[in-house]
C-alpha cells in the first residue's frame, strides 16, 4: 500500500459520518458536491462535511477539528463567525432577506470599495465572481464595439463560457485542459480559444485568445496581429488558480500600456486578491490603473456577493444609463452586503499585519519541514496567499505549474488532514491564512508537517 492509500485509510474511520453524508449527497447532487474541487477528486478519499467553524477552526460532522488553511477559498480573512460580521448579518436578516429594490447599504459598500481602489469610480454589485467577470467582458465589448478577448493560460475567471478556455482552478484540478485532442500552443504564439469543458461550444470561445502567462512578447505579437479587434485583456491581478503564480515585474503595467495604445480595455480580476493581500487588494501592491476590476470573496464576507467596477466613462454604458444590459434579482442582497461591509470595516491595519505575519510563519514552517525531508519544493507567494509546488524549477506560468511534481501532493495532503490541518485539496489551489490563526493552530501545523513532508518524499510518479 502506497503512502497515499495509507493516509486515506487512516482517516477513513475518523470520517465515517462524512462518508455517509457524501454517499447520501451523491444520490441527489452530481458528484456529491456543488463545486467540483470539494469532491477531493485530485487527492482521493472522503470529503469532510463541515458543520460549523469558529476562528481558524473547522469542525466536521464527525466532530474532528481542523486548522483551516483554505478560509472558504479566500474570503474569511477575519476567521469564521467573527462577532462583528455575525451581528451585522443577524441585524440585516431581521429586517428582511431581500427586497428587490435599492437599499442604503448598497451605496455604502460601493463607496467602501471605491475609497480603496482609486481607478474605480463606479461599482455594480452582483452575486458571484463569475457574474462579475462575465459582465465586465460584456461591458468591454459593448464599450469598444470589438469582439475579441485576450486571457491567459491557467487564469480562472469563473465558469462563464467565453472564459472557460485553458483555465485554472477546478478545470486544472480535474484535468479538463489535458484533452489529447487539444493542440499545444507554443510559447509566444497566440492560440484560438479552445473550450475547457464539454458544453462550451467552439463558437462561444472563438473570440477568446489564450496566451501563456507572464509572456509579454506574446501579448505584443497578438496585438500586432489583432489589435483593432481586441476589446479587452483580462487577467487575474495576481493569479491563484494554477496555484499562486505572481506576475513578473512590470507585467501588469505592460498590459496597461499595450491595451491603451490599441484602444482596448484592461480588466484586472481581483476576485481572489481584492481586499485580501492588502486593504486595497493587489492594486495596493502594484497600482496599475485598469479600466475595469472584478471583486468578490473578501468583499462578500463569505456570502454570495461580488462586484465589478471601473472608470465612470465605461461603467455608464451599463443599463439603465446605457445600452449594455446587466441585471440580477438578488444583486445587492441586504444580508450579503451587511456581511461584506462588516468584514471590510473590521479589517484594519492590525488585521493585514497579522495576515502577512501568519503567511510568513506558515511559509517558513512548510519550507523547513520539506527541506528536512529532502523534498524539492518552491513556496510561491503573492502577499499573504501562497502555494507549495513540488520540484526544483520555479513556477512562472501554467505550463511550469503543471510540470511540477503534483503526484506528491495527495500523500502530503492526507497526512496533514489526518493530523487535523485542512490545506487545499488540490495542488493547483492557493493556501489562505486568516488573522485568527494563533499559537495553538501553528503548533498543530508544526506537529503535522514533518510526517506530511516524509509522506511526500516517499511518493513516486505513477
Swiss-Prot record:
Residues 178-200 are annotated as: Disordered. SUPFAM superfamilies: PLP-dependent transferases. The lineage of its organism: Bacteria, Bacillati, Actinomycetota, Actinomycetes, Mycobacteriales. Homodimer. Keywords: Cytoplasm, Isomerase, Porphyrin biosynthesis, Pyridoxal phosphate. This is Glutamate-1-semialdehyde 2,1-aminomutase. It is found in: Cytoplasm. GO terms for biological process: protoporphyrinogen IX biosynthetic process. It holds the Pfam family Aminotran_3. One of its GO terms (cellular component) is cytoplasm. It comes from Mycobacterium tuberculosis (strain ATCC 25618 / H37Rv). PROSITE patterns: AA_TRANSFER_CLASS_3. The modification N6-(pyridoxal phosphate)lysine is found at residue 297. It comes from the Bacteria. GO terms for molecular function: glutamate-1-semialdehyde 2,1-aminomutase activity; pyridoxal phosphate binding; transaminase activity. Belongs to the class-III pyridoxal-phosphate-dependent aminotransferase family. HemL subfamily. Its cofactor is pyridoxal 5'-phosphate. It catalyses: (S)-4-amino-5-oxopentanoate = 5-aminolevulinate. Its EC number is 5.4.3.8. Residues 182-192 have a biased composition (Low complexity).
Amino acid at each position: 500500500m502506497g503512502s497515499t492509500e495509507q493516509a486515506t485509510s487512516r482517516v477513513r474511520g475518523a470520517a465515517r459520518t462524512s462518508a455517509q453524508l457524501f454517499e447520501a449527497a451523491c444520490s441527489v447532487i452530481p458528484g456529491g458536491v456543488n463545486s467540483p474541487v470539494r469532491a477531493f477528486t485530485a487527492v482521493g478519499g472522503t470529503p469532510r462535511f463541515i458543520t460549523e467553524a469558529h476562528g481558524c477552526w473547522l469542525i466536521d460532522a464527525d466532530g474532528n477539528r481542523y486548522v483551516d488553511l483554505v478560509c472558504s477559498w479566500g474570503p474569511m480573512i477575519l476567521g469564521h463567525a467573527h462577532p462583528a460580521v455575525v451581528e451585522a448579518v443577524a441585524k440585516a436578516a431581521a429586517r428582511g432577506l431581500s427586497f428587490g429594490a435599492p437599499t442604503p447599504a448598497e451605496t455604502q459598500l460601493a463607496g467602501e470599495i471605491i475609497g480603496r481602489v482609486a481607478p474605480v469610480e463606479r461599482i455594480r454589485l452582483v452575486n458571484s465572481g463569475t457574474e462579475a467577470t462575465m459582465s465586465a467582458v460584456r461591458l468591454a465589448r459593448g464599450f469598444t464595439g470589438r469582439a475579441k478577448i485576450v486571457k491567459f493560460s491557467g487564469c480562472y475567471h469563473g465558469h462563464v463560457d467565453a472564459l472557460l478556455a485553458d483555465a485554472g482552478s477546478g478545470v486544472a484540478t480535474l484535468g479538463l485542459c489535458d484533452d489529447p485532442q487539444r493542440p499545444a500552443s507554443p510559447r509566444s504564439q497566440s492560440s484560438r480559444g479552445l473550450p475547457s469543458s464539454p458544453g462550451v461550444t467552439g463558437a462561444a470561445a472563438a473570440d477568446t485568445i489564450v496566451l501563456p502567462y507572464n509572456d509579454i512578447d506574446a501579448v505584443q505579437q497578438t496585438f500586432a496581429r489583432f489589435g483593432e479587434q481586441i476589446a479587452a485583456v483580462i487577467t487575474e491581478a495576481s493569479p491563484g488558480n494554477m496555484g499562486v503564480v505572481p506576475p513578473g515585474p512590470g507585467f501588469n503595467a505592460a498590459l496597461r500600456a499595450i491595451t491603451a495604445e490599441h484602444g482596448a480595455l484592461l480588466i484586472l480580476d481581483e476576485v481572489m486578491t481584492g481586499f485580501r493581500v492588502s486593504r486595497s487588494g493587489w492594486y495596493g501592491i502594484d497600482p496599475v490603473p485598469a479600466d475595469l476590476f472584478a471583486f468578490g470573496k473578501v468583499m462578500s464576507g463569505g456570502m454570495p456577493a461580488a462586484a465589478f467596477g471601473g472608470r465612470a466613462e465605461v461603467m455608464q454604458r451599463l443599463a439603465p444609463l446605457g445600452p449594455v444590459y446587466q441585471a440580477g434579482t438578488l444583486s445587492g442582497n441586504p444580508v450579503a452586503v451587511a456581511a461584506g461591509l462588516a468584514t471590510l470595516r473590521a479589517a484594519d491595519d492590525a488585521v493585514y499585519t497579522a495576515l502577512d505575519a501568519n503567511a510568513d510563519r506558515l511559509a517558513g514552517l512548510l519550507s523547513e519541514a520539506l527541506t528536512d525531508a529532502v523534498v524539492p519544493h518552491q513556496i510561491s507567494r503573492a502577499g499573504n496567499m501562497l502555494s507549495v509546488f513540488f520540484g526544483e524549477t520555479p513556477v512562472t506560468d501554467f505550463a511550469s505549474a503543471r510540470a511540477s511534481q503534483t503526484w506528491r501532493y495527495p500523500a502530503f495532503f492526507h497526512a496533514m488532514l489526518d493530523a487535523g490541518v485542512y490545506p487545499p485539496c488540490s495542488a493547483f489551489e492557493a493556501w489562505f491564512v486568516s488573522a485568527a490563526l494563533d499559537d495553538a493552530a501553528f503548533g498543530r501545523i508544526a506537529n503535522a508537517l514533518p510526517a506530511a513532508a516524509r509522506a511526500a518524499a516517499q511518493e513516486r510518479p505513477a
